């Protein structure tokens, strides 16, 4: 049976691991170290570690794999293939070149578009109507290896980064399992990435999280769903942070300055730069838990003045 080392960390990686383990001999799982989580800073294992332990697969958690003692241990396993999915570290050539069939990665974009750590976020932020998964060879350069297979999936207005992570995770696992038989048999010719079409999906900055109400409504709508459920887009209300977790978009145009409020007892609408409307459905005022808009409008939202504007 084909011996595989699997490397991954977040929930996205779990379906890939479980599918692999159902058919192949996964001899080791490499993931990030346990990290403190939440206000109480409880030391918490990555989702992949939990899944690996349930499957009785040995787990390695080096802080920096490149300089760790675990690196030589992994090479000594003499695996046939290395598979990664959102592991979180660039791997040294000594490991990439050690397996018989090399090292491949499950990446959540249609490469060469969106190399990097936040491809799902950027597909939504940019208003894409489709994205997908690419399986490619791993090289030391970030997400630059030749492409082995690729599969597309639509993005709807109802999707956000959370829903697309779930869909792409399952799609990636399916594509990998469909690809491996021919790949291991040497029947697939990998395709180089077109360097002229390369774009990058770098980690989201704090500045990207802040809503600029002078921008068009569709752009703001894409920002809100692209940053939901993490790290979450925010604005200010009476100079205090105000997060918008979920919202809908209305193309109906209204007069009013960007950030102006149109409200009744149960709904809140915000005017954008082109006059179209953002309609928040799940929000989080400063110092409060997140809540649906009806709860907000029946409480603190009742006191909103018609002259109040978001972003001031």
Swiss-Prot record:
Q: Which InterPro entries match?
A: Fmt, Formyl_trans_C, Formyl_transf_N, Formyl_transf_N_sf, Formyl_transferase-like_C_sf, GART_AS, Met-tRNA-FMT_C, Met-tRNA-FMT_N
Top-level EC class, please?
Answer: transferase
- GO molecular function terms attached to this record: methionyl-tRNA formyltransferase activity
Reactions that this protein is recorded to catalyse: L-methionyl-tRNA(fMet) + (6R)-10-formyltetrahydrofolate = N-formyl-L-methionyl-tRNA(fMet) + (6S)-5,6,7,8-tetrahydrofolate + H(+)
Q: What does this protein do?
A: Attaches a formyl group to the free amino group of methionyl-tRNA(fMet). The formyl group appears to play a dual role in the initiator identity of N-formylmethionyl-tRNA by promoting its recognition by IF2 and preventing the misappropriation of this tRNA by the elongation apparatus.
Q: Which Gene3D superfamilies match?
A: 3.40.50.12230
Family classification:
Belongs to the Fmt family.
Pfam families given in the database record? Formyl_trans_C, Formyl_trans_N
Q: Which organism is it from?
A: Listeria monocytogenes serotype 4a (strain HCC23)
On whether Transferase is a keyword of this UniProt record, the answer is yes
Annotated residues that bind (6S)-5,6,7,8-tetrahydrofolate are located at: 109-112
Q: Could you tell me the EC number(s) of this protein?
A: 2.1.2.9
Q: What is this protein called?
A: Methionyl-tRNA formyltransferase
Superkingdom of origin organism: Bacteria
Any one Gene Ontology cellular component term annotated for this protein? cytosol
Keyword terms, alphabetized: Protein biosynthesis, Transferase
């Amino acid at each position: 049976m084909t011996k595989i080392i699997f490397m991954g960390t977040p929930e996205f990686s779990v379906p890939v691991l479980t599918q692999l383990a159902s058919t192949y001999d996964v001899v080791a799982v490499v993931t990030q170290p346990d990290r403190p989580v939440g206000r109480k800073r409880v030391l918490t294992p990555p989702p992949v570690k939990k899944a690996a332990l349930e499957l009785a697969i040995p787990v390695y958690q080096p802080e920096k794999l490149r300089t760790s003692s675990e690196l030589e241990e992994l090479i000594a396993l003499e695996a046939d293939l290395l598979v990664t999915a959102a592991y979180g570290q660039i791997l040294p050539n000594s490991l990439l070149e050690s397996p018989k069939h090399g090292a491949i990665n499950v990446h959540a974009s249609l490469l060469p578009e969106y190399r990097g750590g936040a491809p799902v976020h950027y597909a939504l932020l940019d208003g894409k109507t489709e994205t997908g998964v690419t399986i490619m060879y791993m090289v030391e350069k970030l997400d630059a290896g030749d492409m082995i297979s690729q599969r597309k999936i639509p993005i709807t207005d109802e999707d956000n980064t959370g829903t697309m992570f779930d869909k792409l995770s399952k799609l990636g696992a399916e594509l990998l399992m469909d690809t491996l038989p021919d790949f291991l048999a040497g029947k697939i010719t990998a395709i180089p990435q077109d360097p002229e079409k390369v774009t990058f999906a770098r980690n989201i900055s704090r500045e990207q999280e802040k809503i600029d109400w002078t921008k068009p409504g569709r752009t703001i709508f894409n920002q809100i769903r692209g940053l939901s459920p993490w790290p979450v887009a925010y604005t200010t209300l009476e100079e205090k942070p105000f997060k918008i977790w979920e919202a809908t978009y209305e193309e109906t145009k209204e007069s009013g300055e960007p950030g102006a409020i149109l409200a009744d007892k149960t709904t809140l609408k915000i005017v954008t730069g082109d006059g179209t409307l953002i309609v928040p459905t799940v929000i989080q005022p400063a110092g409060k838990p997140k809540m649906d808009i009806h709860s907000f409008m029946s409480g603190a939202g009742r006191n909103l003045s018609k002259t109040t504007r978001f972003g001031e």
